[in-house]
């Protein structure tokens, strides 16, 4: 009774239930409960069933299958008891007050319809074990049916816009509210939201509605979106989802944030004169507003402006949908994959013996041009050639993705904030901000590449980006290459692309090397072409470019070149001042040679790989996501969930390209100590310190459990507090194609237990396929006796499942002998055998076995270091390799030199050198043995030779040479023996 006493009523109705039960086994109930919970987790958790099963070890998987099959048997043949309940007529004060009647209300009629539809199954329910989980599951199912009936009843009276106001919102109402609970329930359901009658887990709810909260509830709901009922009322009235922050009950306003004193709220909704609802009535329900009172709203814009918290399951989807860089990287990767999979076999392979011309083609401010051509009617008055135009998400602190050349003439650049760009414009000039049109960007890019293929004048088309390509044309030996021919080709290409993209212009750089084609492209912009070959290079050409116009020259390299060569202003100045040796000394050998060749108009070997072996250069080598906006976590649990979602997203992409990964990398951006908690850019990253950590997985894999667990472990090794985290990147490196031989390195140990066919057939149908697939993945075959590894069928690869002593298996002769004994003696013998067996199974037997293993280990260690079968390379001293003979030699050496003025200096150096070699090969224990030997000899001869100079010399050698050597290498000795010591005489 105690387990069901706290159940929450779904519709404030009275439940009468009676339990007819026998006394069940408590342990059995607990085990069944745990299996049910794990089954529920596998079905409805954050991971799918396959991911859940893959995280289990072999033994855990078998135990889970056996318990689940046993639970399923018990549920199909109940013995513990049954629960019978009946639902009375629904009537409450709030229902009459808000809707004007009991059974005529839409919710009451919905419940009655559900009861009538379920009346035929009452006999089945009486004979079923009714658990707490089943009760809440049926409640949730009944709620879903009730809400669907309500929506179907008024679907013709609700506009498509207002029916999506609360899309993706899961709302729970806490306590008394005005309007009432049922009225708010109607508003939520009829306008696209989901209503929760009970709060089983706060993770499932997005908003909590309450009129007032006590202190305890305020603390409990401090990290959740708790709003007043006016938020629902005003959102329905405005026909759009209003910011919940304006209606928050728990959040405290920032000191710098102004309070909204003049915020207009609505306490009630204007209702029709008739509130009773009949099937034939034309009036709308109390949760609906007349259509003419609803202001039109663009749902696309509403969704675009919706901000999703980083702990929301839809955060990654929302983030990538609005990320320009994500679209760029995805399109670029798709272009390269398409080139490798479809077009590479169609192109001519280029060699170093071919004569070719490079056409480097690039759009002029691609995003700004496409956004202008596809602009809405509200921007129809702007002129692309006269007005400064930028493409961005919003205003103020939004980053500028692209700008036209008019805006660039005022100093505006890509990546600049809109507010900063507006300050650079003179008075009277207004900056025009156009939104992203990702679909049009992709269409224009596809038209660009299809036009290049249709021209059929190139032997190779290499995709660099969605708006940039390198095209190669091989010149036959019998055709003379002229600038006139190349100029005609450039004009033809530009004209065809302009027509194919409906108004987008491109610039072309034409040359006989990649680096010169790139520089010529820079000179040709905007909307032009330039033809420059190695044979006609001039000082005027080199004077047109800055140092960072060369490929591979960034900010760091630029500063080194300026400091080394007296701040050259152009490439022509650098060509006059540099020498190859000075260049290599400044920026390194490899980069120095690359810059040297570029200044001669030539390509280095690494750059030429894209022409000679494009498959190797363009194939995907890594897969990653990088989130640096909206990252605000409260605890480690949220971070773990976010990492799991990121890994799941990357694994889906990894499986799409049919690859596995053998190395993963986690990169973090942690807020700087002196940086503000909230940066100027809303939900931005601000000033951060970057950290990264990589891990090798051993063998390539695409298992979620392995990768997600390792990623979370990497996060803990970096030690970043969740509240200080501002950016997070997950990366899969060393991608490998999935093949049949990938599992050759996997080692599968046999199960300690087995699953019988009977137990397997008793499993629930919804998980039987997943478990069977998991067994197939682990290379196990189902046999009549159970599940065993097919690796056991091979004697060469067989493993000993358990080590059985001979005495554990009674022979037939022993049984016959026991049967011939008298009854009393036979009983005594059996009793003694049982005692002996118990002794063997006690801790005493384990202790004796442990002592025996330790002695064997010490003997193996001795043989390992000093025996004839030692794996170490022998270290000689005086042409002796056996340590025992070396000890005898040292002992004799000490004894003979004590009374003779001590050892010779060169002999001491040779001896110390021998000791150092022992330490370097991790044989410090041998050095310790020699030091003890010398110390022991000195102690024995102290009475006779303590006044001799030889005795003092050996003491000095021991104190100044041998003991310090031991202390410097004591960590090796401590690591093996777990000791903490200092060596002293």
Swiss-Prot record:
Its cofactor is Mg(2+). InterPro entries: BRCT_dom (IPR001357), BRCT_dom_sf (IPR036420), DNA/RNA_pol_sf (IPR043502), DNA_pol_Y-fam_lit_finger_sf (IPR036775), DNA_pol_Y-fam_little_finger (IPR017961), IMS_HHH_1 (IPR053848), REV1 (IPR012112), Rev_trsase/Diguanyl_cyclase (IPR043128). DCTP binds at residues 324, 362-366, 402-408, 414, 467. Transmembrane segments: none annotated. Coiled coil: none annotated. Deoxycytidyl transferase involved in DNA repair. Transfers a dCMP residue from dCTP to the 3'-end of a DNA primer in a template-dependent reaction. May assist in the first step in the bypass of abasic lesions by the insertion of a nucleotide opposite the lesion. Required for normal induction of mutations by physical and chemical agents. Involved in mitochondrial DNA mutagenesis. PANTHER family: DNA REPAIR PROTEIN REV1. This is DNA repair protein REV1. It comes from Saccharomyces cerevisiae (strain ATCC 204508 / S288c) (Baker's yeast).
